[in-house]
């Protein structure tokens, strides 16, 4: 009697896809969420940001199993062909975006290639080739031969201006910068200077990123839209900050200093949730003052309606200088340290030590903590690894693992101690609670 062979990896992964997909479908139906669809009116988020944890986990599990199965059955021989298709899809999207093709297509209908080419002022034959390449990734659709319509993916660029800005920034800055990484390493191997980066190579200049960005109103707008899109996503949502730390236990009228807090979106969100707390947002004078700042403050207030009780104030401060506010309960650095190489990061942290000592305060850092390779689903890990490479390409900075964080604290001041590390469910970042221990 022959032995019964165990299921193959192909079958294991296929079963995992089936099981996870059934679970996801159950979650969507039980919550009354619309089913995902390739049609133009399909939901932008398959699982809404505020959905239960189980729904998010089901989506990730489905995507992870499906991706693994795709990679397995593709095999090594298809690696480069698949990558070739990927970059041609990227540049097909760039072409469609540049010539504003999406805006000429009705959201609830279709039109011929001939009419679309005329409206976009592009050659019809080339339009067909580019659009049909994009369609292989469900960007646009051809419901009947010769007729072009929106898909859920392409409709997103019509419905959401921030997504258009993100696409513009990706094509204008992100892709050229990533492409220059080899040249930057050859020219400045091991450099940690913010003026010796792939971004400097890509744009042929010798300024730090934000200084160069400020010289271009167009790129500044694109970058702002890109950041709004990123922060609007589930992984960067401010709810993770609001719910991820025990703010409610802080004494009445405690002061929270939001260092590098820009327009104060994080502080306004916290102020709306915790009316017993006060907030001081610190950033450069050009950020907290002026017409642009006033507009952003107004937008932040309207988004997090908290009344006019003045619990959020602003102070001009450069975090490379000593911390001027010495009576806070919590000093907060959200998405700050990852922009800086170790030397500058230690300066930023070191400037807080006297204030932490004086007020016996807590330092709260919300930033990326790199996972161990393979310890989380690859559909999530690759997002984090992308940010790590971006930090290196643009700033000569990096995302850090737990050991890196502990080392940088220790090298700043041996008394700085990581007391707690927590990653809220669905968050791309972790909350690091740090205190200054007695000698």
Swiss-Prot record:
S-adenosyl-L-methionine binds at residue 283. It catalyses: norrubrofusarin + S-adenosyl-L-methionine = rubrofusarin + S-adenosyl-L-homocysteine + H(+). Its EC number is 2.1.1.-. One of its GO terms (molecular function) is O-methyltransferase activity. One of its GO terms (biological process) is methylation. The keyword Methyltransferase applies. The active site is at residue 338. SUPFAM superfamilies: S-adenosyl-L-methionine-dependent methyltransferases, Winged helix' DNA-binding domain. Transmembrane segments: none annotated. Pathway: Pigment biosynthesis. It comes from the Eukaryota. Keywords: Methyltransferase, S-adenosyl-L-methionine, Transferase. Induction: Expression is regulated by the aurofusarin biosynthesis cluster-specific transcription factor aurR1/GIP2. InterPro entries: COMT-like (IPR016461), O_MeTrfase_dom (IPR001077), SAM-dependent_MTases_sf (IPR029063), WH-like_DNA-bd_sf (IPR036388), WH_DNA-bd_sf (IPR036390). Belongs to the class I-like SAM-binding methyltransferase superfamily. Cation-independent O-methyltransferase family. COMT subfamily. O-methyltransferase; part of the gene cluster that mediates the biosynthesis of aurofusarin, a red mycelium pigment which is acting as a mycotoxin. The first step is performed by the polyketide synthase which condenses one acetyl-CoA and 6 malonyl-CoA units to form the first intermediate, the cyclic heptaketide and yellow pigment YWA1. The C2 hydroxyl group in the pyrone ring of YWA1 is probably formed during ring closure by an aldol-type cyclization reaction. This is O-methyltransferase aurJ. It comes from Gibberella zeae (strain ATCC MYA-4620 / CBS 123657 / FGSC 9075 / NRRL 31084 / PH-1). The lineage of its organism: Eukaryota, Fungi, Dikarya, Ascomycota, Pezizomycotina.
């Amino acid at each position: 009697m022959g032995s019964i062979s165990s299921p193959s990896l192909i079958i294991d992964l296929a079963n995992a896809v089936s099981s996870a997909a059934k679970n996801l479908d159950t979650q969507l139906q039980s919550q009354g969420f619309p089913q995902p669809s390739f049609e133009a009116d399909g939901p932008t988020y398959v699982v809404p940001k505020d959905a239960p944890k189980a729904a998010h986990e089901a989506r990730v599990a489905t995507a992870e199993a499906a991706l693994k199965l795709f990679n397995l059955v593709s095999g090594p021989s298809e690696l480069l062909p698949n990558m070739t298709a990927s970059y041609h899809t990227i540049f097909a999207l760039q072409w469609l975006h540049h010539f504003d093709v999406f805006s000429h297509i009705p959201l609830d209908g279709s039109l011929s290639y001939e009419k679309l080419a005329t409206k976009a002022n592009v050659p019809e034959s080339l339009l067909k080739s580019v659009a049909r390449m994009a369609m292989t990734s469900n960007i646009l659709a051809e419901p009947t031969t010769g007729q072009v319509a929106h898909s859920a993916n392409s409709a997103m660029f019509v419905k959401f201006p921030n997504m258009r800005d993100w696409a513009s920034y990706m094509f204008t800055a992100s892709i050229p910068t990533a492409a220059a990484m080899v040249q930057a390493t050859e020219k400045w191997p091991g450099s940690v200077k913010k003026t010796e980066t792939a971004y400097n190579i890509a744009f042929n200049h010798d300024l730090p990123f934000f200084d160069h960005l400020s010289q271009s109103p167009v790129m500044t707008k694109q970058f702002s839209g890109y950041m709004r899109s990123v922060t609007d996503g589930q992984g960067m949502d401010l709810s993770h900050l609001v719910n991820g730390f025990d703010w409610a236990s802080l004494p009445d009228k405690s002061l929270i200093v939001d260092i590098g807090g820009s327009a104060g979106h994080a502080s306004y969100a916290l102020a709306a949730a915790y009316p017993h707390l006060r907030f001081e947002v610190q950033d450069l004078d050009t950020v907290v003052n002026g017409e642009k700042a006033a507009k952003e403050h107004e937008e932040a207030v309207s988004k997090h309606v908290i009344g006019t009780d003045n619990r959020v104030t602003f102070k001009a401060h450069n975090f490379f200088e000593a911390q001027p506010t010495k009576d806070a309960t919590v000093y907060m650095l959200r998405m700050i340290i990852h922009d800086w190489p170790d030397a500058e990061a230690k300066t930023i942290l070191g400037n807080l030590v006297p204030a932490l000592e004086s007020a016996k305060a807590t330092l709260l850092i919300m930033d990326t903590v790199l996972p161990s390779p393979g310890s989380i689903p690859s559909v999530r890990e690759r997002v984090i690894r992308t940010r790590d490479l971006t930090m290196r390409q643009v700033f000569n900075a990096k995302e850090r693992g737990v050991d890196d964080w502990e080392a940088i604290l220790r090298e700043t001041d041996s008394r700085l101690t990581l007391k707690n590390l927590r990653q809220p469910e669905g968050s791309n970042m972790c909350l690091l609670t740090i205190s200054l221990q007695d000698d």
